[in-house]
Amino acid sequence: MSHLLTMSELSEVEISEILKDAEDFANGKESKTTEQTFVANLFFENSTRTRFSFEVAEKRLGLDVLNFSADASSVQKGETLYDTIRTLESIGTKAVVIRHEQDRYFDELKDQVNIPILNAGDGCGNHPTQCLLDLLTIKQEFGRFEGLQIAIVGDVRHSRVARSNAEALTKLGATIYFASPEEWKDEDNTFGTYKPLDELVPEVDVMMLLRVQHERHDHYETDIMKEYHEKHGLTVEREKRMKEGSIIMHPAPVNRDVEIASELVECERSRIFKQMENGVYVRMAVLKRALPNVLGGMKHELLV
């Protein structure tokens, strides 16, 4: 069964296949089911980009979308996530997309359910589809991963985006650096090396900024926000020192004038809205992989 839970479960070949399908969709290829197929979106945390991106992807593929509301469901009566998924499975749903506040919520589910789980983000743990759309954006820009230098900057400790990207990009041959306030370093993430931001600015090919996750911080940590942009954000002055041909990325939502100067969000280097566009194509590819009997499947040569 083609769950998509973490980037660690995907080989280089599987990543390449997903990216190739996503590129095909980006180039106008159509793939649409002619049989009624239900997919459920279960979002237990707030989301704009991921939720709507999945829904657009599902509808482009001709899938019938069930949007689950935890507040209006039997979760409020104590129903477990397992029972919710089994209920959806029993009434004919063929796959579930889940975002949940619990790290690795899927560990207790993946071997017990009979339909694919597509992880749309688990707590501070993993965000595989965000990683895949980031990979697609980088590949479109540079045509490769091998030898690229990539800085992941900001709230590394709380970021599922940092974990997924650092692991996958290292696997694909890129060199990863982190820049972060001391309070937000993640010493358990061994896929990169910490360096001062101002050393990285003129060196890296990709400046990947992370959202400051106010909802996961205590009061003490929130106090440093006043100085964050000056010390740890991408200011206009820092952008001017970036190397020629380098790009700016951010998973969004963006805290303007915190992680990045507002005037840089749509500057020439920025690929922030391109990432959002690519999210639809990647999620179409991931759904195709999860539902091969409905949407078909194809194999591609390794192109990383």
UniProtKB/Swiss-Prot annotation:
Catalytic activity entry: carbamoyl phosphate + L-aspartate = N-carbamoyl-L-aspartate + phosphate + H(+)
Gene3D superfamilies, sorted: Aspartate/ornithine carbamoyltransferase
Pfam families attached to this UniProt entry: OTCace, OTCace_N
GO CC entries: cytosol
Entries under InterPro entries matching the protein: Asp/Orn_carbamoyltranf_P-bd, Asp/Orn_carbamoylTrfase, Asp/Orn_carbamoylTrfase_sf, Asp_carbamoyltransf, Asp_carbamoyltransf_Asp/Orn-bd
GO terms for biological process, alphabetical: 'de novo' pyrimidine nucleobase biosynthetic process; 'de novo' UMP biosynthetic process; amino acid metabolic process
Molecular function via GO: amino acid binding; aspartate carbamoyltransferase activity
Protein role: Catalyzes the condensation of carbamoyl phosphate and aspartate to form carbamoyl aspartate and inorganic phosphate, the committed step in the de novo pyrimidine nucleotide biosynthesis pathway.
Family listed: Belongs to the aspartate/ornithine carbamoyltransferase superfamily. ATCase family.
Subunit details: Heterododecamer (2C3:3R2) of six catalytic PyrB chains organized as two trimers (C3), and six regulatory PyrI chains organized as three dimers (R2).
UniProt name for this protein: Aspartate carbamoyltransferase catalytic subunit
Protein species of origin: Bacillus cereus (strain 03BB102)
